[in-house]
């Protein structure tokens, strides 16, 4: 694998944001094999639901989102889910790191949130040298290298 895709990169491929044009252009011209993990899928799924629920229904907060899903189901996000699954079907899905000491060390050393540290550890374990992300927290990491989008 040549490039790991982060949630902050995947979401604008599917939902129109201020970074959509850049993300789509980069993705359509990216050489090599792209990868992601199931933790990124879960995060992108959740973030997409939150964005759509807020835009369409003014729903903010996880509790209200959960309540809406219990009452109405996921119908409001069918197109997003279909598109998310389509993006992921074109990626190599790598297993998330389970090296707890590595994840903790990366989080502490680079002041990263746990999920970002998990992504870094996952990239390192799978020898994925680059990450496509709009998350600036990854700019302080040298392995994987944050690519310019």
PLM regions and their residue ranges:
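Structured helix-beta-strand junction loops
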Residues: 29-33, 90, 141
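Histidine- and aromatic-rich ligand-binding microenvironments
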Residues: 5-6, 12, 36, 96, ...
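Active-site neighborhoods of divalent-metal-dependent phosphate/nucleic-acid chemistry enzymes
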Residues: 82-129
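Short, well-structured N-terminal submotif of metal-dependent ribonuclease cores
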Residues: 1-40, 46-61
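Acidic, PIN/NYN-like endoribonuclease modules and their adjacent C-terminal/linker elements
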Residues: 2, 120-149
């Amino acid at each position: 694998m040549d490039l790991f895709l982060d949630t902050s990169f995947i979401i604008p491929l599917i939902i129109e944001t201020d970074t959509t044009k850049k993300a789509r252009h980069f993705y359509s011209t990216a050489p090599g094999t792209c990868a992601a993990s199931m933790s990124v899928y879960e995060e992108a799924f959740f973030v997409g639901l939150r964005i759509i629920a807020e835009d369409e229904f003014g729903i903010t907060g996880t509790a209200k989102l959960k309540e809406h899903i219990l009452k109405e189901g996921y119908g409001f996000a069918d197109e997003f889910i279909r598109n998310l699954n389509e993006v992921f079907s074109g990626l190599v899905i790598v297993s998330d790191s389970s090296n707890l000491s590595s994840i903790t060390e990366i989080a502490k050393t680079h002041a990263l949130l746990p999920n970002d540290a998990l992504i870094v550890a996952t990239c390192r374990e799978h020898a994925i040298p680059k990450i496509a992300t709009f998350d600036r927290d990854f700019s302080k990491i040298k392995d994987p290298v944050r690519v310019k989008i």
